[in-house]
Amino acid sequence: MNIRNNARAFILNDNNKILLQKFEFSFTGALKVLWVTPGGGVETGESFAQALERELFEELGVNVEIRNGSVLTLDIPFEGKNGEFISHEVYYLVRMAEDSAFSLENMEEGEKNTFHALKWWTLDELRKTTDEFEPRDAILRLLENSDIVV
């Protein structure tokens, strides 16, 4: 089975809100709109941390140096239009100010066309929303831990 390596960020602000991006996805054949953590695919020759630094620049227009190790690894099976694959996702914890300036200027054209929104979420908002977000359980567990330190 094919494996797609992805580097992703749990971006938290000083109030332990998490930054999520709303995208539409159609790689499984059906259109799905959901909130996800920033990040993306690891390119040949990149470490996961290097890939995340590049992805955060492309998707958010921010320069971040990943200095800490990963906090979570998930292997998520998908049945896509081109067959089955596993999304091997490595997550890092990143702190940013809530008033950080973000830019979509460096986002790839295909991503710009499927991007809907960017939002800081509280734990309470995520518990109450009917919107889909992933990885749901990991995000909720992270925000329930009130003594997160980076």
What does each model-identified segment do?
Residues 27, 101-150:
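Nudix hydrolase/Nudix homology domain
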